[in-house]
């Protein structure tokens, strides 16, 4: 069975929680020492220039089952630990935090994105592999986080500052530490692949059911694109929950949440203590209405080439426009002034949502 990769959706909040807590209540040494770090940038060359002090995080979801019980693995229908030996990922989000630290943009990148994987050395260091067209998930499988970063930077001309990787267990633990997450579906869901059966309307999901919710993709005919929309809605719900319930401002709740997440999160080795403290102070007042989510603009969801097969092709005009705006830390929403009546109109050509929105209106 194909592994399900849904962990990406909660990681912006995880980053915020880890960062905020590190400099506020738990003690920098304790928190920083608890995070597993890996070197992902050390051997990268010819990288894009950093043209502003905005920050770009690449967040990747690992499909490792480590930490899940046999009953949970069976309930999730994700295959055994043996079947999923090691950690694989082909889902990702890029999180842009503005230079003033008052806005954020979260971009979902489809796992089947058509890409040209740069020339690289094989994982065992024995073979030189030339530039190769493939789906973007191949970059992680062939060369881990460094090759994935190199591929994305070559496609976007956007410098990635930090890397965060999370797991199934990390997602489940975080939702449970929050006491569950409230979601709303406009339509009933009955997905035999994710084992999720849910009536239309408002639901409070625990960690296991939340994992089913963000994995579901076999009930509405929209596949991964529909799943990404639900994932964006879910991360917005997590952000609303964390801020409205006072979790980020409550030392006890934050401590419990941080403990649940730290065991299953790893970051790049350059995300040091000073970075955490500084960013913690800067983003603590970031609100859901200032966080926008979107999928990278697409031109073709069934782009076929003999070498790659069916893939997802980015829009050749809108996608470069989006990356250029993030590179220069420019707004993703255009404000247009009418010359005749001086009225102001907002143009959202990237079809974004804010984390303060939800698909069913008020969840009261």
Labelled PLM ranges:
Residues 2-364:
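Non-catalytic, solvent-exposed segments at the cell envelope interface
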């Amino acid at each position: 069975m194909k592994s399900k990769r849904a962990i990406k959706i909660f990681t912006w909040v995880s980053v915020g929680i880890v960062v905020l807590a590190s400099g506020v209540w738990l003690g920098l040494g304790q928190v920083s020492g608890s995070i597993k770090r890996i070197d992902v940038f050390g051997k990268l060359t010819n990288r894009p220039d950093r043209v502003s002090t905005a920050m770009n995080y690449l967040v990747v979801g690992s499909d490792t089952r480590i930490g899940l019980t046999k009953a949970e693995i069976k309930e999730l229908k994700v295959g055994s630990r043996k079947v999923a030996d090691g950690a694989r990922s082909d889902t990702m989000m890029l999180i842009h935090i503005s230079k003033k630290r008052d806005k954020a943009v979260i971009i979902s990148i489809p796992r089947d994105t058509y890409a040209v994987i740069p020339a690289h050395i094989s994982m065992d260091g024995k073979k030189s592999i030339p530039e190769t067209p493939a789906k973007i998930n191949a970059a992680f499988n062939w060369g881990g986080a460094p090759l994935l970063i190199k591929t994305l930077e070559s496609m976007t001309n956007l410098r990635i500052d930090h890397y965060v990787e999370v797991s199934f267990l990390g997602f489940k633990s975080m939702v449970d530490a929050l006491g569950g997450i409230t979601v709303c579906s406009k339509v009933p869901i009955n997905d035999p692949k994710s084992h999720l059966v849910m009536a239309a309307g408002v639901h409070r999901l625990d960690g296991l059911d939340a994992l089913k919710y963000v994995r579901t993709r076999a009930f509405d005919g929209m596949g991964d694109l529909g799943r990404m929309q639900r994932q964006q809605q879910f991360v917005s719900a997590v952000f609303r929950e964390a801020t409205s319930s006072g979790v980020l401002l409550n030392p006890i709740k934050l401590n419990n949440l941080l403990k649940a997440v730290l065991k299953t999160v790893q970051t790049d080795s350059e995300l040091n203590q000073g970075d955490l403290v500084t960013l913690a102070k800067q983003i603590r007042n970031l609100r859901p209405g200032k966080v926008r989510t979107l999928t990278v603009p697409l031109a073709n969801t069934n782009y076929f080439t003999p070498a790659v097969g069916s893939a997802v092709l980015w829009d050749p005009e809108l996608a470069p426009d989006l990356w250029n705006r993030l590179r220069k830390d420019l707004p993703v929403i255009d404000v247009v002034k009418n010359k005749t009546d001086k009225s102001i109109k907002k143009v959202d050509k990237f079809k974004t949502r804010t984390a303060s929105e939800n698909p069913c209106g008020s969840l009261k």
